[in-house]
Swiss-Prot record:
Keyword Nucleotide-binding among record annotations: yes
Protein name: Methionine--tRNA ligase
Subcellular location: Cytoplasm
Gene Ontology MF annotations: ATP binding; metal ion binding; methionine-tRNA ligase activity; tRNA binding
UniProt remark on cofactor binding: Binds 1 zinc ion per subunit.
Key words, A-Z: Aminoacyl-tRNA synthetase, ATP-binding, Cytoplasm, Ligase, Metal-binding, Nucleotide-binding, Protein biosynthesis, RNA-binding, tRNA-binding, Zinc
Source organism phylogeny: Bacteria, Pseudomonadati, Pseudomonadota, Gammaproteobacteria, Alteromonadales
Motif ('HIGH' region): 15-25
Gene behind the chain: metG
Substrates-to-products reaction catalysed: tRNA(Met) + L-methionine + ATP = L-methionyl-tRNA(Met) + AMP + diphosphate
Every tRNA-binding domain range: 587-688
Biased composition (Basic and acidic residues): 554-564
CDD domains named in the record: Anticodon_Ia_Met (cd07957), MetRS_core (cd00814), tRNA_bind_EcMetRS_like (cd02800)
Pfam families according to UniProt: Anticodon_3 (PF19303), tRNA-synt_1g (PF09334), tRNA_bind (PF01588)
Amino-acid positions noted as binding ATP in the UniProt annotation, renumbered to this chain: 335
Organism field: Shewanella woodyi (strain ATCC 51908 / MS32)
């Protein structure tokens, strides 16, 4: 283990249970997951917990519109959220719901402790009431003009424009967001948390390093104005927990939502004998608790939440880490432009590891907004992950398998390996401080060194000389060892790739194993690890994300004529297919023939003759549609070497873009044979 073991509890903000996860949400879960996985990789006891935020009027009203009970709706959303997170490789130790037994008990317990300590006040307030729906209006269901900056169409609790918070009654020209009616004032007894009683503690805590300086400076405005008592109750009808000893009164969603962190962890503790709730939440706990949140909810997590914990006798968070918003192509996410992208839409078209890496490459420990530039996204993934990282293995692994029985050599010159290992402390510090972008740059700089080493050593040339076989063996072994170190450094960011590399290397990638000696170790046969991002997949995401009222055109039925219906010509090849007319050498020289490895082969729906091939050129991947379906099953092609025309102009087909042509011989149907080069040929080599 790298250092003494820490006990860490880490959380992400709870997604609201009335809609799907989108790529704006995913920034936070990817950021938290990377940090959590890093802590586990270092050997620490780290628990990453989360839950759906499942209470409030919005959920109650949406369930009514759907004609179902709120419990049914939030259960359905919970399943969808968990599936999206799992498919993005978000590794929660527990994902729960605020509508749970644990959260009800903890919310009541904290409230009663606050009440008994004198921190709960009651008073009658005049509240906005919808006369058409006969209900008091929650903050978010009243809209009007901000009383501070005069921005229109703002919610009743805070202003998106200036960030001010206020009471719904402070709005100018309020309207009910439920019915559109002008609300009337009606008296109601409400419960308040005495936040001003904690002003001294909060002032010190927010300046203690527990939150970022930018956030502490912003919260300073609250202290300048003087903290106010916080309304924690809502009137029936309301979907949530009823306040003890107060029939018809319910906890405001922002009271029980952060308690949901505790509720989810309590649920985990109750299912595991090795976890104790008090070890993490008791006043004298030595464990670390970290909250990752968006900058829009810092007041709840950095003022109300630590004050509630302090007043109820629990420990406060070690730190609250805030991040900025996500923009797409330099602008706010837009449904009309197709840039308001749901997690599921992305997953239907692209590898989640791509987005994990791109977000990591742009994240820092600050609260800056992050722009998802889709062209830059494709270029960075293709350059860094495919061109630099995976290319390192694809260029060298084949020699180990074919020439050296799959076993790695003892490397004499380990100077480059020592350079790689010498970066582990810096990379660990960057992960720890959430400077993921800087960490990615350090790792990719190492990848550049490794690729330059392979290019200079040129094992594909060494392998041709019988006197240099051992040198070639060492170069390839060294390259794969450097590749192992790089993927270990990237394991928190690219967990699926790391799993695949562990299977390929037949060796666990852990921080403690970074300096392992793998001389004589046997590896498995190399398989393609990652494909290039194709802009057509990004275009498909944008198109699927647009608000479009025009029904999609029904897919055309496939031609029912079978490939086997084509008559077979039994004449000799030259008679049935004479040699074409003569061309000049200059014309032939324009054709760039390259060795390619078939990384992936799959059927093309509605195409009787085509297979879709992903061809690895040893640093670049091209997609080709080949008319060889009658002769080959996709699974029989994967891993084979073949010859392709690499500089053929891309051709847009009904099924996608074809970026070249594979060479095959034969009259057709089952009598087709793709060209397969002899052993020693490598992807990317020119055929002369």
């Amino acid at each position: 283990m790298a250092n003494s073991q820490r006990k860490i509890l880490v959380t992400s903000a709870l997604p609201y249970a009335n809609g799907p996860i989108h790529l704006g949400h995913m920034l936070e879960y990817i950021q938290t997951d990377i940090w959590s996985r890093f802590q586990k990789l270092r050997g620490h006891e780290c628990h990453y917990i989360c839950a759906d935020d499942a209470h409030g009027t919005p959920i109650m009203l949406k369930a009514q519109q759907m004609g179902i009970e709120p419990e049914e709706m939030i259960a359905q959303v919970n399943r969808e959220h968990q599936q999206d997170f799992a498919d993005f490789n978000i590794q929660f130790d527990n994902f729960h719901s605020t509508h749970s037994v644990e959260n009800r008990e903890l919310s009541s317990d904290i409230y009663l402790k606050l009440r008994d300590a004198g921190f709960i006040k009651t008073r009658t307030i005049s509240q906005l009431f919808d006369p058409e729906k006969s209900m008091f209006l929650p903050d978010r269901f009243v809209k009007g003009t901000c009383p501070k900056c005069k921005s229109e169409d703002q919610y009743g609790d805070n202003c998106d424009n200036c960030g001010a918070t206020y009471n719904p009654t402070d709005l100018i020209n309020p309207k009910s967001a439920v019915s559109g009616a002008t609300p009337v004032m009606k008296d109601s007894e409400h419960f308040f948390f005495d936040l001003p009683a904690f002003e001294t503690m909060l002032s010190e805590w927010t300046r203690s390093g527990a939150i970022q300086d930018e956030i502490a400076n912003k919260l300073g405005e609250w202290f300048e104005q003087g903290l106010q008592q916080w309304d924690i109750s809502r009137d029936a009808p309301y979907f949530g927990f009823e306040i003890p000893d107060a029939p018809g009164k319910y906890f405001y969603v922002w009271l029980d939502a952060p308690i949901g962190y505790m509720g989810s962890f309590k649920n985990l503790c109750d299912r595991r004998e090795d976890l104790n709730f008090d070890d993490f939440w008791a006043k004298d706990s030595s464990a670390e608790v970290y909250h990752f949140i968006g900058k829009d909810i810092v007041n709840f997590h950095s003022l109300f939440w630590p004050a509630m914990l302090e007043g109820a006798g629990f420990r406060k968070p070690t730190s609250v880490f805030a991040h900025g918003y996500v923009t797409v192509n330099g602008a706010k996410m837009s449904k009309s432009k197709g840039t308001f992208i749901k997690a599921r839409t992305y997953l239907d078209n692209l590898d989640p590891e791509y987005l994990r890496y791109y977000y990591a490459a742009k994240l820092s420990g600050r609260i800056d907004d992050l722009d998802l530039n889709l062209e830059d996204f494709a270029q960075r993934v293709n350059s860094d992950l495919v061109g630099k990282l995976v290319n390192l293995a694809s260029r060298t692994a084949g020699f180990i398998s074919k020439r050296f029985d799959g076993k790695l050599a003892k490397v004499a010159d380990t100077s480059l390996e020592q350079t790689f290992l010498g970066k582990q402390t810096l990379i660990a510090e960057l992960y720890e401080s959430r400077e993921f972008g800087k960490a990615m740059r350090e790792i990719m700089a190492l990848a550049d060194l490794a690729n330059a080493y392979v290019a200079d050593a040129a094992p594909w040339q060494l392998i041709k000389d019988e006197a240099k076989q051992e040198e070639a063996h060492q170069v390839c072994s060294n390259a794969l060892n450097l590749f192992r170190i790089l993927v270990t450094y990237l394991k928190p960011v690219l967990p699926k790739l790391a799993d695949d590399v562990e299977a390929f290397l037949q060796f666990p990638l852990t921080w403690d194993n970074l300096n392992a000696d793998l001389a004589g170790h046997e590896i498995a046969k190399f398989k393609a690890l990652m494909q290039r991002v194709d802009m057509k997949n990004i275009e498909a995401i944008i198109e699927a994300s647009k608000d479009n009222l025009v029904p999609a055109e029904a897919p055309k039925k496939a031609d029912s004529k079978k490939a086997t219906d084509t008559p077979v010509d039994t004449r000799p090849p030259l008679e049935s297919d004479p040699i074409s007319e003569e061309i000049s050498f200059e014309d032939f020289a324009k054709i760039d023939l390259r060795i390619a490895r078939i990384a992936k082969a799959e059927h093309v729906p509605e195409a009787n003759k085509l297979l879709k091939l992903q061809l690895d050129l040893g640093g670049e991947t091209k997609q080709v549609f080949a008319g060889i379906k009658s002769a080959y099953a996709p699974e029989d092609l994967e891993g084979k070497l073949t010859v392709m025309v690499a500089n053929l102009a891309p051709r847009k087909m009904r099924f996608g873009m074809s970026e070249g042509m594979v060479l095959a011989a034969g009259p057709g149907n089952k009598d087709l044979w793709i060209l397969e080069p002899h052993e020693g040929a490598q992807p990317g080599m020119r055929v002369k």
